């Protein structure tokens, strides 16, 4: 059986960025990694209704900076910033260092695979037919400007006794083209028949040229030679 590589991991360092960006020695690495996991787990549970796509964590010296990518920043910030201040204190307590929380609004949630997958799972939990939920998500994503999308659901679909997998694709989804900007995410629907898994691939176009996940060093400026130019001679 053919297995598919994770579309984001294979593109790290080429056109994709890491969700955790920090350096640590051998003793601190495991502690920081576990701290990142706990922070993401807490935010996902606490902000389950805020349509969170992903969380980027940076660790400047003796502090932590968390950026929350969400389609509903108002729920994260709260009235006069009260909710985000509570989150900051809880994150600082979990990480053990002073915390800073930023929010980034996702303008087009139809092009975010995590939000699309969560939308499908919420419909499945409300007993919407899985084919209708899949086709509706595909149509909305293509209408928003995507070049291609693939949606896959697996489990006891429609309450069947034997689990199966069904998928629907529209447009192009080139998984092995490294310059292809493909986003991928998953979600789970907990129904009365069991768990139904949802996978979403979204192709947004090709990124041409060199795109690295770090700033390139500035080229040294060429010093102008003193003296008269040929025009002045």
Swiss-Prot record:
PROSITE patterns on file: KH_TYPE_2, RIBOSOMAL_S3
GO MF term list: mRNA binding; rRNA binding; structural constituent of ribosome
Domain of life assignment: Bacteria
Record keywords, A-Z: Ribonucleoprotein, Ribosomal protein, RNA-binding, rRNA-binding
SMART domains: KH
Domain KH type-2: 39-107
Signal sequence extent: none
Keyword hit for Zinc: no
GO term, biological process aspect, one: translation
Transmembrane stretches, start-end: none
GO cellular component, as recorded: cytosolic small ribosomal subunit
Quaternary data: Part of the 30S ribosomal subunit. Forms a tight complex with proteins S10 and S14.
Membership in a protein family: Belongs to the universal ribosomal protein uS3 family.
Function: Binds the lower part of the 30S subunit head. Binds mRNA in the 70S ribosome, positioning it for translation.
Entry protein name: Small ribosomal subunit protein uS3
Source organism (scientific name): Hamiltonella defensa subsp. Acyrthosiphon pisum (strain 5AT)
Gene encoding the protein: rpsC
């Amino acid at each position: 059986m053919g297995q598919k590589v994770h579309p984001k991991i294979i593109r790290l360092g080429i056109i994709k960025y890491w969700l955790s960006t920090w350096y640590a020695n051998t003793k601190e690495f495991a502690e920081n990694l576990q701290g990142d996991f706990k922070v993401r787990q807490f935010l996902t549970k606490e902000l389950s209704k805020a349509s969170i796509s992903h969380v980027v964590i940076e660790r400047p010296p003796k502090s932590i900076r968390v950026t929350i990518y969400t389609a509903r920043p108002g729920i994260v910030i709260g009235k006069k910033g009260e909710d985000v201040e509570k989150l900051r204190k809880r994150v600082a307590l979990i990480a053990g260092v002073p915390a800073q929380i930023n929010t980034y609004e996702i303008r087009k949630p139809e092009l975010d695979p995590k939000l699309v997958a969560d939308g499908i799972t919420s419909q499945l939990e409300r007993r919407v037919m899985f084919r209708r939920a899949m086709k509706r998500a595909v149509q909305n994503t293509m209408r928003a400007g995507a070049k291609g999308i693939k949606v896959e659901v697996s489990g006891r679909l429609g309450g069947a006794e034997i689990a199966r997998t069904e998928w629907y694709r529209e447009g192009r989804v080139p998984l092995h083209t490294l310059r292809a900007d493909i986003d991928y995410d998953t979600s789970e629907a907990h129904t009365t028949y069991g768990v139904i898994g949802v996978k979403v691939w979204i192709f947004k176009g090709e990124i041409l040229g060199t795109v690295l996940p770090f700033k390139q060093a500035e080229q040294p400026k060429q010093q102008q030679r003193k003296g008269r130019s040929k025009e002045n001679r």
